[in-house]
């Protein structure tokens, strides 16, 4: 197939239908520094795995199309993508999507303006006759490898999976927000052990693409900020067949200043809490969890140990207790406040925030979010020192154990979230029990 540079509007007409069975969508905005490598890796992945020379699971030839969903980059991103693809054995279709005024001033936590619009444009481009699988890649990733494409598409094309979530290699200290809140809460709510549900890449089936496009979430504020989490939750709660694919390291091209932790908590945790309200009939019926199969062999990676000031984390927790205790009483019962008070005078090396207490704290904040006991932004920001206290406690417990031991420790935490879930359910059903 010949590479083209055609362009169309995401809200006007879909790209012209082709015989493609696989669509790879790249979401981009001012990614000129990375888009060339991303596009080249996508091209190589398609050629190596799906052109008949290196079959994947018996699939000899899979016709493919590359779709670039660009948000109006002014740095030459689309041109650089076309140059990198060259005479690729795939069709490049550029899909522009409008960004609402203010997008550049209200950047989501993953740093991508109007990401929900970009993903919707890609899904609409993949919702054409004959397409069996769609893979989404972010144009700002520095570490995309050709193997990512068959890893994300293969389980859909060859094994009947509907949603393929990446599993990235991370040091035990990395991805702490995912390990401490997102993963255990997601697992307890939806009953699936999807370990990294907030990342920006995935593979999806035609059935899942159609379900996403039929959902009425695209114009909601929570979707604009946390669309990746919503897509993962939709797959988990919708009865679709899920798996994970090991992709190695993921590093991202950052633009501008990184968001502060409070803003990140507002956006990431706020998305999860908003999803609780929308899927209450699903998660209240879920008990326990089931593992998600890992399809493929993890690539060999070398992980560097981040430098973390544990004493500084503990001091931030203690300062937060002194300054925010009265605010916390609006969302936590007296017993939890007393348990936190006991941590103020503990020597740093013996600082431990128990798993069951941490799970109840997260559930209390979810209930406080639902009941609007405080402005939601203020409520979620007040979670920051509590999260830092949990992080300090976790680092102290895993810093001298091998990676397998750190993984086992997160498993214990996730089990605590499952065990404490009735606490959330009962207070959700009977709000008068809140803060008791």
Q: Each PLM stretch: what is its role?
A:
Residues 131-142:
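Short beta-strand-to-loop acidic/aromatic patch adjacent to the donor-nucleotide binding site
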Residues 144-167:
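Conserved donor-nucleotide/metal-binding helix-loop-beta segment in metal-dependent transferases, i.e.
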């Amino acid at each position: 197939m010949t590479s083209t540079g055609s362009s169309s509007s995401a809200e006007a007409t879909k790209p012209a239908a082709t015989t493609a069975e696989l669509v790879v969508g790249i979401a981009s905005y001012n990614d000129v520094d990375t888009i060339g490598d991303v596009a080249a890796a996508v091209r190589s992945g398609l050629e190596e795995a799906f052109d008949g020379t290196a079959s994947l699971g018996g699939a000899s030839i899979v016709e493919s199309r590359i779709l670039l969903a660009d948000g109006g980059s002014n740095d030459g991103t689309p041109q650089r993508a076309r140059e990198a693809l060259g005479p690729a054995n795939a069709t490049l279709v550029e899909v522009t999507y409008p960004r609402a005024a203010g997008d550049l001033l209200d950047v989501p936590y993953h740093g991508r303006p109007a990401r929900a619009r970009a993903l919707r444009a890609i899904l609409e481009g993949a919702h054409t006759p004959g397409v069996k699988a769609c893979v989404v890649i972010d144009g700002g990733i520095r570490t995309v490898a050709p193997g990512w494409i068959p890893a994300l598409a293969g389980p859909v094309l060859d094994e009947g999976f509907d949603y393929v979530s990446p599993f990235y290699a991370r040091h035990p200290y990395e991805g702490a927000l995912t390990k401490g809140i997102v993963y255990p809460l997601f697992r307890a709510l939806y009953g699936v052990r999807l370990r990294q549900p907030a990342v920006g890449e995935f593979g999806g089936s035609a059935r899942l693409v159609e379900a996403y496009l039929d959902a009425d979430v695209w114009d909601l504020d929570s979707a604009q900020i946390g669309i990746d989490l919503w897509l993962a939750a939709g797959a988990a709660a919708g009865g679709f067949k899920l798996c994970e694919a090991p992709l190695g390291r993921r590093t991202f091209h950052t633009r501008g200043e990184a968001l502060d932790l409070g803003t990140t908590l507002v956006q990431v945790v706020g998305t999860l809490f908003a999803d609780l309200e929308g899927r209450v009939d699903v998660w209240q019926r879920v008990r326990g969890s089931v593992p998600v199969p890992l399809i493929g062999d993890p690539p060999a990676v070398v992980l560097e140990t981040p430098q973390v000031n544990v004493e500084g984390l503990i001091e931030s927790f203690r300062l937060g207790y002194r300054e925010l205790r009265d605010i916390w009483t609006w969302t936590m019962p007296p017993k939890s406040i007393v348990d936190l008070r006991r941590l103020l005078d503990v020597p740093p090396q013996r600082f431990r925030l128990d798993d069951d207490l941490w799970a109840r704290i997260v559930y209390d904040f979810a209930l406080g979010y639902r009941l609007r006991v405080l402005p939601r932004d203020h409520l979620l920001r007040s979670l920051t020192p509590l999260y830092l206290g949990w992080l300090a406690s976790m680092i102290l417990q895993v810093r001298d154990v091998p990676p397998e031991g750190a993984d086992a420790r997160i498993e214990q935490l996730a089990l605590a979230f499952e065990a404490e879930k009735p606490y959330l359910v009962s207070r959700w059903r009977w709000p008068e029990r809140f803060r008791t």
